[in-house]
């Protein structure tokens, strides 16, 4: 049975990543996953938080936000409330944690990469789209440092992407839930994986329901299918830099000789 938007159970929504979307940021993209659209930027700061000074390692941190009319009903800006919501804080930490998992922070050196993810239109999967887009923005920012001679090689070990999976009352296990599917799902799960197929994070909950080990395995298999396709889109967006993911510093030095 086809889903409401005509997709099969294990089919992603159309995904587009537009690189160099913002003029001033060292790295930036607009990522579109169906009707969900997120602007992701990466900013390089030549210092680290005070607790890391002198340690010889860099840091990656993230901020996440949503425009008031990214949703069907207007949301009040968090700046107007004077505090960041628990949901926003959780997503920010997830994005930063995910990106740090594939970066050699020692090779990055004592600098901070600020990731900003701003949702301009939301239709489910904003946190997973943010991770997938932020990864490309991060690579573009680090590529600029390599081009400028401030880094000898990309300090990135592997690709990284994220997607959602769930169990729908009618369709069973489905990939890449939109807002309406997420609202009715019996089980909702966000999965972050590397290009090598290793898991970075799995966030899964039953909504007034339980799920079996067999269903968990099926959910993770569907997520892996989707993430492999997302990484293919990332590769196209990165162009020649995609081939340099995971390169060693020594190899990069030989290429420049």
Swiss-Prot record:
Q: Which Gene3D superfamilies match?
A: GHMP Kinase, N-terminal domain (3.30.230.70)
Alphabetized HAMAP family for the sequence? RNase_PH
Gene this chain is encoded by: rph
GO terms for MF: 3'-5'-RNA exonuclease activity; tRNA binding; tRNA nucleotidyltransferase activity
At which positions is phosphate bound? 87, 125-127
* UniProt key word Transferase: yes
| Alphabetical list of InterPro entries matching this protein | ExoRNase_PH_dom1 (IPR001247), ExoRNase_PH_dom2 (IPR015847), ExoRNase_PH_dom2_sf (IPR036345), PNPase/RNase_PH_dom_sf (IPR027408), Ribosomal_Su5_D2-typ_SF (IPR020568), RNase_PH (IPR050080), RNase_PH_bac-type (IPR002381), RNase_PH_CS (IPR018336)
Instruction: Tell me which family the UniProt entry assigns to this protein.
Output: Belongs to the RNase PH family.
Protein's GO biological process: rRNA catabolic process; rRNA processing; tRNA processing
What Enzyme Commission number(s) appear in the record? 2.7.7.56
Could you tell me what this protein does?
Phosphorolytic 3'-5' exoribonuclease that plays an important role in tRNA 3'-end maturation. Removes nucleotide residues following the 3'-CCA terminus of tRNAs; can also add nucleotides to the ends of RNA molecules by using nucleoside diphosphates as substrates, but this may not be physiologically important. Probably plays a role in initiation of 16S rRNA degradation (leading to ribosome degradation) during starvation.
Name this polypeptide is given: Ribonuclease PH
User: Which reactions fall under this protein's catalytic activity?
Assistant: tRNA(n+1) + phosphate = tRNA(n) + a ribonucleoside 5'-diphosphate
rRNA processing among keywords: yes
Enzyme class, one word? Answer: transferase
Its assembly, as annotated, is:
Homohexameric ring arranged as a trimer of dimers.
Report the domain of life of the source organism. Answer: Bacteria
């Amino acid at each position: 049975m086809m889903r409401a938007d005509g997709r099969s159970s294990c089919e992603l929504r159309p995904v587009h990543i537009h690189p160099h979307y913002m003029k001033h940021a060292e790295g930036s993209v607009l990522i579109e996953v169906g009707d969900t659209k997120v602007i992701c930027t990466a900013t390089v700061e030549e210092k680290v938080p005070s607790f890391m000074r002198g340690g010889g390692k860099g840091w990656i941190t993230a901020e996440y936000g949503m425009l008031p009319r990214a949703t069907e009903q207007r949301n009040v800006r968090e700046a107007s409330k004077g505090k960041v919501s628990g949901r926003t804080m959780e997503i920010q930490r997830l994005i930063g944690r995910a990106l740090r998992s594939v970066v050699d922070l020692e090779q990055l050196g004592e600098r901070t990469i600020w990731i900003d993810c701003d949702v301009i239109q939301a239709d489910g999967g904003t946190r997973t789209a943010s991770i997938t887009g932020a990864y490309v923005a991060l690579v573009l920012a680090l590529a600029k440092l390599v081009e400028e001679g401030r880094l000898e090689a990309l300090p990135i070990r592997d690709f990284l992407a994220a997607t959602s999976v769930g169990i729908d009352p009618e369709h069973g296990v489905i990939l890449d839930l939109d807002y309406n599917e997420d609202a009715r799902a019996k089980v909702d799960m966000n999965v972050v994986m590397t290009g090598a197929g290793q898991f970075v994070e799995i966030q899964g909950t039953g909504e007034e329901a339980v799920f079996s080990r067999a269903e968990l395995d099926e959910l993770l298999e569907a997520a892996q299918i989707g993430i492999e396709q997302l990484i293919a889109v990332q590769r196209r967006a990165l162009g020649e830099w995609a081939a340099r993911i995971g390169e060693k510093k020594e190899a990069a030095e030989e290429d420049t000789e």
